[in-house]
Amino acid sequence: ALSISGVALEQLEIHAPAVIDLLHQLNDTGCCEFLCEPYSHGLSSLANEDCFREEVLRQRDKMKQMFGKEPKVFRNSSLIYSDEIGGLVASMGFKGMLTEGAKHVLGWKSPHYVYHCNQAPSLKLLLRDFKLSDDISLRFSNSDWAEYPLFADKYINWIDVLPQEEQVINIFMELSALGMAQPLSSNILEFLKALPECARAKGITFSTPTEIVTKLKSVSQLDVPYPMSWVDEERDTSSWLGNVLQREAFNKLYSVAERVHLSDDRRIKQDWDYLQASNNFRFMTTKNTGIWLNRGIYDSPYDAFTNYMNILGDFIKRVNSLYPEDVDSEELNSLLTTIKNHGDEITELQKEVAKWQAKAEKETAAKKTAAKKVVVAKESVVKKEPTAKKSATKKTAESKKAVGRAKKT
């Protein structure tokens, strides 16, 4: 399965349409499933329910439009999950969700089973095996790793020796692992190409997330009162919201969420998506994890914070120019709702007028057709009359001749 944000798809459509063609080819195989995620790959699930719903539904529409199928399985940005988030996802009609098999949540349980959300039993949960996933995405080319070099047959053997009853092994990783975190010179692609054949030899099969949540039953509910993710040793959200800088930027961004949500300005909406991207906050982290962190164009978390706040300040000015700060949000919402309702009413009236116009045109056309038929019929009658008169005249003349003959006799 692949999960690609709406913002990423937009960029691919503009700058790398060949990649979109490849994605369509994958889709045509019927062996690749496209998942749903937040449109911006952001953190709205931690901040604002309305924003989260809006961008998830927008992403679902985008995926259906591009690939012809409505996603049934959801994965949040960086696999962020909690009981509350699971309930929201289930309420939008999703059947399954991917998340992290974090030790502090699972305890003695294994991630190799299907679980379900404790707020919505209909939402099945697929948990990442972080060891097997990170063996590929983080450790594959590390020559200091005890298992280096890793070959496909060895990797499949690790899976094969797991208990027979553990039927689901979920390997989730960032696509950047293939070529960036693990350079192509490490033969990472050759490793992946060899996996299916090695798996087949051991009787191990591959499935899409939807196939798993459809075929397998949940063994238990999963209790996650606080958000978890697949990032860092803590498997929490501290990588994005762990310091004062990050929380300041995050809170300021979502302070205008309601006004942006009410806006129909295309550029405002687009920049809102860009500003929500989770990496904006990840670049500001001051955590020392021992793992190399790509900070993008920034040399330090402070550079990232300064630049982001400058851009965010400009964005908020643009939002306030549309919807002034001195207008209460509830009052603004009420006014915009009234305008929208009037607009909807006008649209309905226009549809009604168009309907009556079409009906009137149809009736006029029918009357013209009927009038034409009557005219044609009259012409036919008129043309037949001379023949009738001739016949009558002939009969009268013959009668007169007969009478004349009778008189002579």
Where on the chain are the PLM-derived regions?
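Active-site beta->alpha N-cap acidic-glycine motif
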Residues: 1-28
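Acidic, His- and aromatic-enriched active-site or binding-groove loops in soluble protein domains
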Residues: 19-36, 69, 90-111, 115-127
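Generic structural signal for well-ordered alpha-helices
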Residues: 20-24, 53-60, 86, 156-159, ...
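Alpha-helical scaffold elements lining the catalytic groove of polysaccharide deacetylases
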Residues: 42-65, 122, 127-163, 182-185, ...
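Short, charged, surface-exposed secondary-structure boundary motifs
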Residues: 45-47, 105-113, 135-136, 218
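Catalytic domains of cell-wall/extracellular-matrix polysaccharide-remodeling enzymes
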Residues: 57-112, 178-192
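Active-site and substrate-binding clefts of carbohydrate-active enzymes
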Residues: 113-114, 119-123, 142, 160-358
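Intrinsically disordered, polybasic Lys/Arg-rich low-complexity tracts
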Residues: 358-409
